[in-house]
A protein has these predicted regions:
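Class I SAM-binding transferase module
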Residues: 2-62, 66-326, 330-359
Length: 359
């Protein structure tokens, strides 16, 4: 079981910022997402491989973007698809849908899902690509949950259905040398001032699997049929055992796995790994954004430890550490994310802690 320490109260639906919405109208952003074949193929394969689930059904696409998921659903036989987006990209989606001959099946609506008036009372399926960096940065999950509670039939299906989140410590002296130690001597000059922010802000990078110095720990599962808004801020316990000796622990990385299950009764173990799901012959579709698989546009969230303040200790294989991981939302930016970690090696007396911003 994944142990929960506490879940701070968080019940209001976050509102997207205008800069965030303007970014979503740019073609290059959508090109990047569509060319992420791990992401797009997973949605396509689940929908096309389960046409019987979509045939004759009413589908709601929350945050439809270019309309690609709505088009998949219509082509799979959905009788009606309602595509909703709060940015100007909806005009492009409407044109894409018309050009592909699905205007009679897909209805496009611009506005917040909480404010638009749908032409139906209930839907059979909600499909959405809402995930952000570290899963919840600039994510639309608040709105998807609202749509589920308002529009999804009791027997309805969420696509995707489950998210498993992972954390593990990393040791990457090459990255530290290139991006942190570099500034200490630039052609003989001290430019440490340029390091500002690199250990304060989470980085979005695709890390080599070789940088992992422990087995990943599954710290959170979201079951989209049941998750509530207050579940999106949390503190979780985690632990790890070093699988190799290291000169210093340089940080942590966070990623998520997505699961698409054909029935709301289907369960996904909290420690299920997406990269092993299909190989094990499990039903549904799964993909990972982790470092041991093909890169996705989400990459991983990298939290570098500020080892300048205190010289880190070398560690031996087999040493164990544990701590807490916290996600919170800053009051002044509802789309931002603050990640806080605490950690302590069993051999140490002192616990360490650090926070990182994603904004």
């Amino acid at each position: 079981m994944i142990a929960t320490i506490s879940a701070p109260t968080h019940t209001t639906v976050r509102s997207p910022s205008q800069p965030h919405l303007s970014l979503l109208t740019r073609s290059d952003i959508h090109e990047t997402m569509l060319k992420d074949t791990i992401r797009t193929d997973a949605y396509r394969d689940f929908i096309y491989n389960h046409k019987s689930l979509f045939a004759g059904k009413t589908v709601l696409d929350v945050g439809c973007g270019t309309g690609i998921l709505s088009l998949f659903c219509a082509k799979a036989g959905a009788s009606r698809v309602i595509a909703v987006d709060n940015s100007a990209i909806i005009d492009k989606a409407r044109e894409n849908i018309f050009n592909n001959g699905f205007s009679s099946t897909i209805t496009c609506l611009r506005g917040k899902i909480e404010e638009v008036v749908l032409p139906v009372e209930k839907v059979d399926i909600i499909v959405s690509e809402w995930m952000g960096y570290c899963l919840l940065y600039e994510a639309m999950l608040d709105s998807v949950i609202w749509a589920r509670d308002r529009y999804l039939k009791p027997e309805g299906l969420m696509v995707p259905s489950h998210m498993n989140m992972w954390v593990t410590p990393i040791a990457d002296p090459d990255y530290v040398a290139d991006h942190i130690a570099f500034w200490r001597d630039v052609y003989g000059f001290d430019m440490k001032a340029m390091q500002a922010g690199i250990v304060d802000d989470a980085q979005v990078l695709n890390m080599p699997a070789s940088t992992l110095c422990a087995e990943p720990f599954p710290f959170l599962q979201l079951s989209l049929h049941e998750t509530t808004v207050k579940d999106l801020v949390f503190k979780k316990k985690w632990n790890a055992k070093l699988t190799t000796g290291i000169d210093a622990m340089d940080g942590f990385i966070i990623w998520f796995d997505s699961f698409f299950m054909p029935s709301r009764e289907d369960e996904v173990p909290e420690d299920a790994k997406a990269e092993e799901w299909g190989k094990a012959g499990k039903k549904g579709i799964a993909f990972t954004t982790g470092p041991k698989a093909k890169e996705t546009h989400w990459k991983q969230g990298v939290m570098l430890i500020d080892n300048v303040k205190e010289k880190p200790l070398s560690r031996k294989e087999g040493e164990q550490l544990s701590g807490e991981l916290e996600y919170s939302v800053p009051e002044d930016n509802s789309r931002a994310l603050k990640v806080r970690m605490t950690w302590k090696f069993d051999e140490d007396e002192k616990e360490s802690s650090q926070s990182w911003n994603m904004k």
